[in-house]
């Protein structure tokens, strides 16, 4: 199963994103395939915060458009909801220790812990996931 990170969702959704032309076709293939994938609610919250933010995008996505994207992706039959499970804090601590994570790396460790617990590969444009030895990481084409 794939766990999709916010930067992949932003690149797929926003036509003005520098990686849109390469990430969107990859993302469309993911949606058309039968491979299970997940987008944790934490990632969706980040997506909504960033894509509708005037400080991030000169022309932010209208909130209705952003939610329509969220709902369309979540409606895919092979999208499986995930959330932190009973081992989350133990896994989070392990990942933080192995990568000496603090500050801005903590959210990546949180996603990594969800991925490990649910046997997912993290799909992200963020190279920081390589710092977590026990997290499988896939970088879509850019």
From Swiss-Prot:
Cofactor: Mg(2+)
EC number(s) on file: 3.1.-.-
UniProt keyword terms in alphabetical order: Hydrolase, Magnesium, Metal-binding, Nuclease, Toxin-antitoxin system
Function text: Toxic component of a type II toxin-antitoxin (TA) system. An RNase. Its toxic effect is neutralized by coexpression with cognate antitoxin VapB25.
Sites where the protein binds Mg(2+): 5, 108
GO terms for biological process, alphabetical: negative regulation of growth
UniProt xrefs under SUPFAM superfamilies: PIN domain-like
Cystine pairs: none
Domain of life where this protein originates: Bacteria
Protein name as catalogued: Ribonuclease VapC25
Presence of keyword RNA-binding: no
Keyword Magnesium found: yes
Annotated source species: Mycobacterium tuberculosis (strain CDC 1551 / Oshkosh)
Enzyme class: hydrolase
GO molecular function, one term: magnesium ion binding
Any Pfam family: PIN
Similarity comment: family membership: Belongs to the PINc/VapC protein family.
Domain PINc, residue spans: 3-139
């Amino acid at each position: 199963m794939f766990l999709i990170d916010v930067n992949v969702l932003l690149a797929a959704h926003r036509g003005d994103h520098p990686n849109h032309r390469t990430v969107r076709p990859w993302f469309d293939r993911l949606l058309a395939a039968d491979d299970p994938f997940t987008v944790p609610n934490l990632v969706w919250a980040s997506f909504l915060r960033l894509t509708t933010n005037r400080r991030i995008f000169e022309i932010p996505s209208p909130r209705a458009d952003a939610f329509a994207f969220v709902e369309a992706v979540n409606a895919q039959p092979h999208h499986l909801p995930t959330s932190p499970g009973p081992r989350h804090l133990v896994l989070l601590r392990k990942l933080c220790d192995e990568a000496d994570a603090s500050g801005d790396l903590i959210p990546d460790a949180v996603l990594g812990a969800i991925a490990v617990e649910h046997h997912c590969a993290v799909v992200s444009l963020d190279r920081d996931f390589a710092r977590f030895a026990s997290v499988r990481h896939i970088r879509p084409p850019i």
